[in-house]
């Protein structure tokens, strides 16, 4: 009948953020879900992996000129447990926990927001665009959360291992840093942090996107087992470690209590090379490798599973 209204498929929306996409079109994740799922994943992950983060930071701060206090990873753990008990490996956890939740929330929220704009009409995101979205997510988390929180964390851990600690707790430490150094005291090493986080997430999301696309093949909505997601995450984490550990070392030095020794990020890199040699740029790689692989695997597994639950209870049509 000529007067009948023309039927328009409710699925004819290439970029709709729905829980049920048409066959052959990838489901997109609403940024709001990504923020919530990312925050949950970040909080759980850091509680599990913090001891390796503590050891990594201690080894990086243990400069050769001191002379070195620790002989290696095992010695660092041994001395810490002997002096402070097992709980000593969790000193500084509060500062990192307060930052981990919003960091992961910003990272995944920004990544999903950017990727939803850059996917093709079938909803697929190629690995190159995944790298760009990851870079954007990394820069955002660096500026909004990571730099101020990491600066406080490094100063707090460094202070707690000194002969006469002056910070009574996380919030007291923050107040003292702001009181004596101003807000800029929480933004030391911003350039190094942006470079580190940007390259970190660019590498991780590039690898994850490439592996996911390979695994799913021609079916963009093919379900991925959590174990597989974890393996992909571990590979992505390892790639990021070897790709930017030097930046991580520079960032840690720039945010430590002796950051005043360096005029800039470049000056820090030059002095490390001049006085400690190229090997110093990879100091703490082993503990960082273990932590990051576990970190990324856990975060992606929890994130993906939480998103699945949210898709059932939070409709975003």
From Swiss-Prot:
Knockout consequences: Morpholino-injected embryos display altered tail morphology, impaired swimming and defective touch-evoked escape responses. Neuromuscular junction development is abnormal and motor axon terminals show short and erratic outgrowth toward the muscle fiber with no evidence of complete synapse formation. In addition, knockdown embryos often show edema of the hindbrain, heart, yolk sac and tail.
Solcar repeats: 29-117, 128-214, 224-309
Transmembrane segments: 35-55, 130-150, 223-243, 294-314
Main subcellular location: mitochondrion
UniProt PTM: Possesses a short cleavable presequence, which, however, is found to be dispensable both for targeting to mitochondria and insertion into the inner membrane. However, the presequence is required to keep SLC25A1 in a soluble state and thus in an import-competent state. Mature SLC25A1 lacking the presequence is prone to aggregation.
A biological-process GO annotation: neuromuscular junction development
Keyword Ribonucleoprotein: no
Superkingdom of source: Eukaryota
Single GO molecular function: tricarboxylic acid transmembrane transporter activity
Catalytic activity: (S)-malate(in) + citrate(out) = (S)-malate(out) + citrate(in); D-threo-isocitrate(in) + citrate(out) = D-threo-isocitrate(out) + citrate(in); citrate(out) + succinate(in) = citrate(in) + succinate(out); cis-aconitate(in) + citrate(out) = cis-aconitate(out) + citrate(in)
Keywords linked to the UniProt accession: Antiport, Membrane, Mitochondrion, Mitochondrion inner membrane, Repeat, Transit peptide, Transmembrane, Transmembrane helix, Transport
Bilayer topology annotation: Multi-pass membrane protein
Disulphide bridges, residue numbers: none
GO cellular component assignments: mitochondrial inner membrane; mitochondrion
Residue positions assigned to the propeptide: 1-20
Compartmental location: Mitochondrion inner membrane
PANTHER family attached to this UniProt entry: SI:DKEY-178E17.1-RELATED (PTHR45788:SF6), SUCCINATE/FUMARATE MITOCHONDRIAL TRANSPORTER-RELATED (PTHR45788)
Family according to the record: Belongs to the mitochondrial carrier (TC 2.A.29) family.
UniProt function note: Mitochondrial electroneutral antiporter that exports citrate from the mitochondria into the cytosol in exchange for malate. Also able to mediate the exchange of citrate for isocitrate, phosphoenolpyruvate, cis-aconitate and to a lesser extent trans-aconitate, maleate and succinate. In the cytoplasm, citrate plays important roles in fatty acid and sterol synthesis, regulation of glycolysis, protein acetylation, and other physiopathological processes.
Name used for this protein in its record: Tricarboxylate transport protein B, mitochondrial
Organism expressing this protein natively: Danio rerio
Record gene name: slc25a1b
